[in-house]
Swiss-Prot record:
<dbReference type="InterPro" id="IPR036611">
    <property type="entry name" value="Trigger_fac_ribosome-bd_sf"/>
</dbReference>
<dbReference type="GO" id="GO:0044183">
    <property type="term" value="F:protein folding chaperone"/>
</dbReference>
<dbReference type="GO" id="GO:0005737">
    <property type="term" value="C:cytoplasm"/>
</dbReference>
<keyword id="KW-0413">Isomerase</keyword>
<dbReference type="InterPro" id="IPR008881">
    <property type="entry name" value="Trigger_fac_ribosome-bd_bac"/>
</dbReference>
<keyword id="KW-0132">Cell division</keyword>
<dbReference type="GO" id="GO:0051301">
    <property type="term" value="P:cell division"/>
</dbReference>
<dbReference type="GO" id="GO:0043022">
    <property type="term" value="F:ribosome binding"/>
</dbReference>
<dbReference type="GO" id="GO:0015031">
    <property type="term" value="P:protein transport"/>
</dbReference>
<keyword id="KW-0963">Cytoplasm</keyword>
<dbReference type="GO" id="GO:0003755">
    <property type="term" value="F:peptidyl-prolyl cis-trans isomerase activity"/>
</dbReference>
<feature type="domain" description="PPIase FKBP-type">
    <location>
        <begin position="157"/>
        <end position="242"/>
    </location>
</feature>
<keyword id="KW-0131">Cell cycle</keyword>
<dbReference type="GO" id="GO:0061077">
    <property type="term" value="P:chaperone-mediated protein folding"/>
</dbReference>
<dbReference type="GO" id="GO:0043335">
    <property type="term" value="P:protein unfolding"/>
</dbReference>
<dbReference type="Pfam" id="PF05697">
    <property type="entry name" value="Trigger_N"/>
</dbReference>
<comment type="function">
    <text>Involved in protein export. Acts as a chaperone by maintaining the newly synthesized protein in an open conformation. Functions as a peptidyl-prolyl cis-trans isomerase.</text>
</comment>
Amino acid sequence: MQASIESTGNLERRLTFTLPQERLETHVGGRLRELARTTRIKGFRPGKVPTKVIEQRFGQQVRAEAMEGLLRETFDSAVREHSLRLAGNPRIDQGESDFDFVATFEVVPDFGDIDVTNLSVVRHTAEVTDADIDQMIENLRLQRRTWNPVERGAQVGDLVALETWSQAGNERLPAEGVETGSSVLGSGVMFDQIEKGLEGLSKGEDKALSIDFPADWRVPQLAGKTVQVHVKAVEVSEPVLPEVNKEFIKSFGVKSGDAEQFRADIRTNLERELKGALMNRLRREVGEQLIAAYAHVEMPPRLVENEARSMLAQQVDQMRRSGRNPGEIPADAHQGFMDAAAKRVLVGLLVGEVARRNELRLESKRVSETLRLIASTYEEPEQVIEMYRNDPQLMSGLQSRVMEEQVIDWIAERAKHTEQSLSFQDAIRV
C-alpha cells in the first residue's frame, strides 16, 4: 500500500494514500457475478441474466459501495501502519487521480505519564431513607391535587388566576387589554416580586406593583427597568390533596393497591435516581481533577470547535423545547463555549488514554445491568431492551457511557479519595 504522512500542525496530520485498483476491480467483478446469479429480471431466466445487463443496472452502485468500503479499509490500515491515534473523524478528499486520496485529521496529544494516584477525589455517598419515600409520596399527592375556589386572601400554595398589564415609561404592555394567566404561589414560575405581591389578594382585588426587572430579563421592553405592574386576582383556589388509598396507589401502576409494595417501588426508583446522581458527581469530581492536572496539554483545535458547536446546538434545542425563542444565532456564537468545550475534550481524551494504557475492557455484564436499569423506567421494559439491541447507534452510545463510567470508577479507586456523606436531596441536587 502506498501511503505517506506529514505534520501540518502540532496535532494535525495529512495522510496521502492510494487505493489498490486491482482489489477494487476484483471486488466489483465478484459482486456483479453474484448479482447475476441471484437477480430476477423480466425476460431472463433466473441465473441467466447477461453480465452486460447487470453492469448497466447495478454497476455504478456496486462500484460506489466497493470504493467506499475499500477507502475506509485502506485508510484504517494506513493509520495502523503509522501508529496514529485519531482525535475525531478525518476529512478525506480526492487526490490527483481517481484512486489517490488525501486525509486530514487531528491526533490525540501526548499526555506524558498519566499518574492518577496524585489526584484528590471526594467520593460522595448517600442512601434513601423512609423520610425520602414519605416526601416522594407527598410530591405524588401534589401532582394529583385538585383545586377548590376560596374567598380568602391568596397564600403560598394557592393557585391564582390573574390578569396583568404593565407600564414601562411611556410604553404599555400589552398595548390594549390585559394578559391572563395563572400561577401557584411559591412555585417560582413567576417573577419573585410579582408572586410576593399576589399574596393576600382575594378574588376581584387588584394591586399596582413597582418591579425592578434585571437587565437580562426575557422581555426586552421590561429588561433593566422599574416597571409598574398591575395585577388582579380573578380567582383564588386552594389545593385539595388526594388520600393515599388503594385507588391512589393503583393509579401509579401498583395493581394490588398495597401500600408496602408502593413504598418498595418508590424506594427502587429513588435508589436508581440516586445511583445516577452519585455517578454524575463522581464524573464531575474526577473531571475537575483531570482538568487541573493536565490543563497545560494542547487540545486538537478542530475537535474543540466541533464540540463547542455541538454544545451551542444543544442549548438552542433546549430553548426551543422549552418554548423560548433562541433568536438569530450569530455565526460565531459557538465561541462562547470554547473554554467549556476544551475541558470536555480534554477529559474525554484522557479517559480514553487511561482505558487504552491500562487495557481496560468494556464489561458486558455492566452494559446489561445499565440497559435493564434504563428499561425499567418504561412501561414495556422488554421492548426497550429489544430496541437497543436492534439499534447499533443506541447500543454504541450505551457502551460508550458504560465504558466511561468504568474508567471513572477505576481512576477514583486509585486516586487519593475521601468520602463525604450527603442526604438524598443534597445528592440529587445539581
